[in-house]
UniProtKB/Swiss-Prot annotation:
Protein's recorded name: Protein B14 homolog
Protein species of origin: Rabbit fibroma virus (strain Kasza) (RFV)
Pfam family, one: Poxv_Bcl-2-like
Family of the protein in this entry: Belongs to the poxviridae B14 protein family.
Top-level lineage group: Viruses
Amino acid sequence: MAFYVRRNNFDAEDSVLLAVQDYLRWSSTPFRDREPAGCVFAVFESFKRDASIVFRDNVRWLVRCSYKYVDSSESLIRAMLRHDNYITEACAVIGLLAQVAEYWGYDNPIPISARVIELFMRLIADYEISHIRSVINIRLQCFAPRKSRNI
């Protein structure tokens, strides 16, 4: 079922939406049951740092509130976005939702991942998808294996 979990590259024909959905499903799976992830998911894991930058001290609170109050958490998340850096904020939303999936999905990952994916689809605008693609490709360069240099 996981299409992107072991991927180390992200090509022009790859779907950002499917990759993020796959990542959010993977995030809701208990750690002991997760498949080892490739570089694409390592990039998505780096989005959690963006969440801590954008949402600051509210990350834990938002994670705890998001399960029971999905609809109100959407409005809370929107209210905390300043819209001064759309790219970082889009990545932060993905990072935050991954933390929600991890926190709440442990015992029952399928309904949790479905709720988190639904929330993701409501929070991310279409124009942000291409920006997320750019971030994935740029950050993948950081995770690419270093070629040894012969001096």
